[in-house]
Amino acid sequence: DSIWIGSDRNIQTLNNLQRLLGSGRLANTGYVSILPVDQDIEHTAGASFAPNPIYFDPENIVRLAIEGGCNGVASTFGILGSIARKYAHKIPFVVKLNHNELLTYPNSYNQIMFGSVKEAWDMGAAAVGATIYFGSEESRRQLVEVSEAFEYAHELGMATILWCYLRNSEFKKDGVDYHAAADLTGQANHLGVT
């Protein structure tokens, strides 16, 4: 309680944060385990699920999260939307709003919106999530889009999760890849919480 009392978030947002923190095996421990499954869009379903074909069925993804004792499950509109009526009240949903797709060549590291905050709210999601590729040509647009989406999510009472990644070909110099450098990733995370 001492963490949330001073928050400027509305009561419904705090309620949904508590839904996430108070679910699963780690309930109310201060730790969170959310099963993230958006690889089917980011890396193709075949590459992601071929070793375990039962996960082509969205229901099995949610069952895995529940049986694994996760606090929540984060996935796409398609996966969560197809089973929302059966599971949204059993485990907190985090709907991923934007995605990159690998069919465009060359890959542009461009996260685009696949649905709306209102659609996620209507399917019973406790939270929405989004990715920003800091350093990419599209990162400024992504910042504006995600910021506006998260503002609306908070108005509706949803929690928000931001995934911060670095994507810039200039971060590779003389055979060294600096995408995982502490100063660069730290700056991306700092920008993400600002």
Label for each model-derived stretch:
Residues D1-V37:
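N-terminal basic, low-complexity leaders that serve as flexible interaction/assembly modules and, when applicable
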Residues A27, V32-I34, Q39-T194:
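Alpha/beta enzyme core
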